[in-house]
Amino acid sequence: MSFEEEEEEETFEHTLLVVREVSVYKIPPRTTSGGYKCGEWLQSDKIWSGRLRVVSCKDRCEIRLEDSNSGDLFAACFVDPGRRENSVEPSLDSSRYFVLRIDDGRGKYAFIGLGFAERNEAFDFNVALSDHEKYVRREKEKETGETSESDNHIDIHPAVNHRLKEGETIRINVKPKPTTNGTGMLSAALSGTGKPKPLALAPPPKAAGVTRSPLPPPPNDPVASRIASDGCKESRRNEPLSDLSQLKKNLPSTAGSGSSKSTGAASGWAAF
């Protein structure tokens, strides 16, 4: 490989994320080992605002803070594989703020506060860093897999011909399965010489002796009205109290008794 190809391979970069506007703060020194809180950062401590780019350079990931107009580099944070927590630390009281460890490339470093305007931008920032870690892990697994396959190479013997030659046969002994009780009873019933007796079924229940009443005739039917009048006459003829002429003959006359009572009363009054 020539020197130019090595230089191109070293300078190969892949941009993972671009955020147009971020803010950088001068943060006070950490007093406890718990972490940083963005609530302690003052608005007057804001020292810079510009563009953020997350760039993948082979195994290393770089967080670059650049000028939005000119593209000049303000600061850079280098994230080594497997050591993300040493370079990028999230704030304890907000998901939009982080603390970056910036390096000048000569062994000097400092800690600054990084703030995103929107929560989804901070989420994309975390996703970009995680994607780079996964990419580096896959590349390492691929390299180790290739080396292990080359070291553990096994010669495969040619396939053996197991086909039968002319005149050869195969004998297979099959053990009969034991019959269960249900299948034995069924087979015994089917193998019997006698004819199977038909099942005696009970006769269906008789219908109840209920007769339906005939439908009434229409009200204006002349035949129905004539039958009704004849029936009324017949019923009156058969009633014992319908003819009272015989009783009137046997009853005493009320006219004579009434006249006798009236004459007796009159005579009694005159005598008084």
Curated annotation (Swiss-Prot):
Q: Enumerate composition-biased segments (Polar residues).
A: 243-252
Q: Which GO terms describe its molecular function?
A: ATPase-coupled transmembrane transporter activity
Know the name of this protein?
A: Uncharacterized protein At1g03900
- Protein's GO biological process: endocytosis
Q: Which SUPFAM superfamilies match?
A: PH domain-like
The biased composition feature labelled Low complexity covers: 253-272
The biased composition feature labelled Basic and acidic residues covers 136-156, 231-240
Locate the region Disordered.
136-157, 174-272
Q: State the Pfam families in the record.
A: DUF1681
InterPro entries, alphabetically? NECAP_PHear (IPR012466), PH-like_dom_sf (IPR011993)
Q: Which CDD domains match?
A: PHear_NECAP
The UniProt entry's GO CC annotations, sorted and at most eight, read: membrane
